[in-house]
């Protein structure tokens, strides 16, 4: 009986430790809009060139990109609020306070990499880049994993024959991990 009690206690401790790292993301209460540097009035930063029939990337809508800041704690990373952040890309920029959601344009196969910089008193300034990924292709290839080797081979063949020019592209979450400033500033 003591062995079962011991086992139950350790399983509870282990389960609590595992679930402790699964904190829900902090709530975001507003959406930040971009500032175009191309003269565009809307989300499509290539719109002024598009009106003149210039060759520009195909506009494919927009996405709310999450910008989140974390600090290294003794047991892992902990999300924090209040960092001053900026986002820059080809044709646009935005400033926000973390956590935030920023509405950014999407261009089929040609979305710009995002440069996200965050700073907060007591932490070192940090910049990361966030590259867009082909979400259509990723979903297609992931579906083959469930079918084993045969499924993966079939999906790889389908992917090779597919017209990927109309695929949807997305950005992942911009996760900026800030390190404590050793100088204490």
What are these regions (language model features)?
Residues 22-185:
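Short loop/turn and low-complexity linker motifs enriched in small/turn-promoting residues
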Residues 1-24:
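Sec-dependent bacterial lipoprotein signal peptides
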């Amino acid at each position: 009986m003591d062995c079962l009690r011991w086992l139950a206690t350790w399983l509870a401790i282990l389960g609590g430790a595992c679930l402790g790292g699964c904190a829900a993301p902090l709530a975001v209460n507003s959406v930040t809009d971009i500032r175009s540097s191309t003269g565009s009035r809307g989300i499509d930063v290539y719109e002024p060139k598009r009106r003149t029939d210039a060759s520009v990337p195909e506009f494919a809508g927009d996405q709310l990109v999450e910008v989140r800041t974390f600090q290294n704690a003794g047991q892992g990373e902990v999300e924090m609020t209040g960092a001053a952040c900026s986002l820059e890309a080809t044709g646009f920029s935005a400033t926000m306070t973390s956590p935030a959601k920023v509405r950014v344009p999407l261009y089929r196969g040609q979305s710009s990499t995002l440069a996200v910089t965050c700073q907060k008193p007591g932490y070192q300034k940090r910049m990361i880049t966030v590259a867009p990924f082909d979400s259509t292709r990723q979903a297609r290839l992931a579906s083959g994993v469930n079918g084993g080797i045969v499924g993966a081979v079939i999906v790889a063949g389908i992917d090779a024959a597919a017209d990927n020019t109309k695929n949807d592209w997305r950005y992942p979450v911009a996760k900026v991990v800030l390190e404590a400033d050793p100088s204490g500033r």
